[in-house]
Amino acid sequence: MSTNTRCPWVGKLPIYIDYHDKEWGKPQFDSQKLFEKICLEGQQAGLSWITVLKKREAYRAVSHQFDPAKIAQMTEQDIDHCMENTGLIRHRAKLEAIVKNAKAYLAMEKCGENFSDFVWSFVNHQPIINDVPDISVVPARTETSKAMSKALKKRGFVFVGETTCYAFMQSVGLVNDHTNNCCCK
């Protein structure tokens, strides 16, 4: 196997190659980083991931590096300012979702529920390494992502449908869907 072989969806953009090689499918256990990813996956709904990836630094800036306590304090006026920011996806419901999700995250913490433990419980705290001979076998959603979506919604999260949850699971390494010949498998 060539050390340069990557999943075919990566393409040639350096930002995408870097994301694929250093983040996608790598197990992430930090609760705040997991929170960032679930929020960003929600921003992707209906768009390509590269669109969100290119805007990630702008999201980090307006969300105080995805600090849930600071995000939860954001007001309608703050959202109005975000709507004027060309560095963000200017979709009010998606921007408001980040605030709602921060409040849901904090409510979980208040009840003694650790976000990382919660997320990883869906895969018994072990990454699932899938057999992926080619990307055509990778599902858009699974029973596990369906269960995660339902559990997140029950806790007050929004923009966390089954497909969004599966993309989240892939991105944070709950599942490894790198193709079998990928250098990152």
PLM feature spans:
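HhH-family (HhH-GPD) DNA N-glycosylase catalytic core used in base-excision repair
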Residues: M1-K185
